[in-house]
């Protein structure tokens, strides 16, 4: 019998960039298509997406993209992947709407969408897929039961078990248990919160905290959160109605997502409660709530611009209550701390998660993960969606529940897993890695470019310009030194003059400089100017010699 191949293209050893291909016979379906924030050392990079070389090589066999929910780490790569490997997209109403919006921003059309609801079953090639309702920090999140002749795989997606969700739709434990009773070949379950004991707090708790903060606030209330957290936004709106406040949205993603959510009925805001940011001056401070982006301290976000007095319409001032309803994504802690400090400097009363319950996670903690394992009862378990220590801890948790060690498989990027009822084998290698997006360029920035950017950012640049006669090969001008990001020339004229003399000494070794000599001349200038500067001030600027024919 043919085997099912599970091919992770992202989401292993990292929190984000989630993408997994499932292959049986001639058919491939892809679960999720996410991006991840660039690391601090990825200078100038806007976004990081999965390497889809394997999908491009097999593009005629890719039948569908199955999307668990609409967070960026699950849909952020769609504008870059779908044009290169097109296939129909399956997702819930909000998920498809968010992807359509992203594609429209990139002027991408001709992608077929299929809107599904929980419990729907779709047939895609050799696969039958059932979508299963789960609770998460965004509406429309689903798990999936993916069935092929080799067996059924449960993909949990991001989930938690919230018994009091805002929309009243709890994680469908009955359907998950029913699949467990039938027999599940394997389960891929998220590992984000596996290090946390107990249960994740209910989203309803945030509404109670908001109620108390609204009751006590005397001035404007400004709340920063992720635009995709519509259940939390709805709780803010409900408190605005109760306390007679108006609400406005600030930040491109906040405006776009809330507008889209209202259009499809996922967010309900009475017309007389919603106002435009330009109308804020028409209301007293205690009548205003501003919902904005910037919970991660992003430099160009709405909250950061308000705190730094760079926003055209809004500045933080004495008497404002600012609520940061999120926890920092790993790597963003310093930026968030800086923005909190700046908010205090502006005179605001700042509320964040260390002070009050203004954020809860959307991911399952240990006891919820144990319940998922107990209900699904998979033969094989593959932890996903987490850094390596999280995958390891999740594997250990599965073994504590009685799963044989040989049936718990921690995959690495570049590996594939071949599964049948009788055996599981790790194969590979599969092309894998990260593709960096810089502006409109996708994949044209690699490690060499990043190394140069890092070099420039740390030590600056010196350009050495030399003019050489095309006819005689004699030096006609220069060497002229131009410094950028290295030293302030007017205050370091002696240093720059010395470097110029070093470059001149290199040129004087040549009676004539023919084109065949250019490489050796440039290398000589680079090496000797570098050594001169390092000996004097122990710094390593990038040296860029330029020879111009005159």
Language model: regions and residue ranges:
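Conserved hydrophobic residues forming the short capping helix/wall of the S-adenosyl-L-methionine
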Residues: 103, 398, 533
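Short Gly/Ser/Thr- and Asp/Glu-enriched loop/turn motifs at secondary-structure junctions
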Residues: 117, 412, 539-543
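Broad gene-expression machinery/nucleic-acid interaction feature
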Residues: 126, 141-143, 459-463, 543-545
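Hard-cation-handling environments
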Residues: 195-325, 329-498, 502-514, 522
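C-terminal tails and terminal domains of large nucleic-acid-associated
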Residues: 514-550
């Amino acid at each position: 019998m043919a085997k099912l191949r599970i091919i992770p293209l992202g989401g292993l050893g990292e929190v984000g960039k989630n993408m997994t291909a499932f292959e049986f016979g001639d058919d491939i379906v892809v679960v999720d298509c996410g991006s991840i924030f660039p690391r601090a050392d990825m200078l100038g990079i806007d976004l990081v997406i999965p390497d889809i070389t394997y999908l491009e090589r097999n593009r005629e066999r890719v039948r569908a993209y199955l999307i668990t929910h609409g967070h960026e780490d699950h849909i952020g790569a769609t504008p870059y992947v779908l044009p290169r490997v097109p296939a129909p997209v399956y997702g819930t109403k909000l998920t498809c709407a968010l992807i359509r919006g992203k594609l429209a921003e990139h002027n991408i059309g001709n992608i077929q969408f299929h809107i599904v609801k929980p419990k729907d079953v779709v047939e895609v090639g050799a696969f039958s897929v059932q979508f299963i309702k789960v609770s998460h920090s965004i509406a429309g999140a689903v798990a999936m039961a993916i069935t092929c002749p080799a067996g059924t795989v449960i993909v949990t997606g991001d989930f938690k078990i919230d018994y009091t969700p805002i929309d009243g739709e709890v994680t469908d434990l009955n359907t998950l248990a029913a699949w467990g009773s039938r027999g599940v070949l394997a389960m891929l379950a998220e590992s984000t919160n596996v290090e946390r004991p107990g249960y994740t707090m209910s989203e309803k708790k945030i509404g109670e905290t908001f109620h108390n903060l609204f009751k006590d606030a005397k001035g404007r209330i400004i709340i920063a959160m992720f635009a995709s957290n519509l259940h939390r936004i709805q709780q803010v709106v409900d408190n605005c109605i109760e306390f007679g406040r108006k609400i406005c949205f600030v930040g491109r993603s906040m405006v776009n997502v809330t507008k889209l959510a209202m259009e499809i009925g996922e967010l309900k805001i009475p017309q007389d409660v919603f106002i435009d940011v330009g109308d804020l001056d028409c209301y007293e401070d205690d009548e205003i709530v501003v919902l904005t982006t910037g919970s991660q301290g992003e430099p160009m976000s709405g909250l950061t611009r308000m705190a730094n007095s760079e926003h055209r319409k809004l500045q933080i001032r004495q008497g404002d209550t600012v609520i940061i309803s999120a926890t920092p994504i790993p790597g963003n802690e310093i930026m968030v701390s800086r923005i909190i400090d700046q908010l205090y400097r502006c005179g605001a009363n700042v509320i964040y998660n260390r002070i009050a319950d203004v954020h809860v996670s959307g991911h399952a903690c240990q006891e919820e993960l144990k319940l998922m394992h107990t209900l699904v009862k998979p033969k094989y378990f593959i932890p996903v969606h987490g850094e390596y220590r999280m995958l390891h801890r999740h594997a250990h948790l599965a073994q504590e529940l009685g799963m044989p060690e040989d049936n718990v498989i921690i995959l690495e990027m570049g590996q594939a897993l071949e599964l049948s009822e009788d055996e599981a084998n790790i194969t590979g290698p599969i092309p894998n890695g990260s593709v960096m997006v810089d502006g409109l360029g996708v994949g044209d920035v690699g490690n060499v470019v990043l190394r140069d950017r890092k070099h420039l950012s740390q030590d600056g640049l010196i350009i050495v310009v030399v003019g050489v006669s095309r006819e005689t090969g004699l030096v006609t001008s220069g060497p002229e030194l131009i410094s950028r990001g290295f030293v302030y020339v007017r205050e370091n004229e002696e240093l720059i003059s010395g470097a110029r003399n070093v470059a001149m000494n290199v040129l004087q070794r040549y009676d004539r400089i023919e084109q065949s000599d250019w490489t050796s001349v440039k290398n000589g200038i680079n090496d000797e100017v570098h050594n001169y500067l390092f000996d004097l001030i122990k710094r390593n600027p990038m040296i860029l010699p330029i020879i111009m024919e005159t």
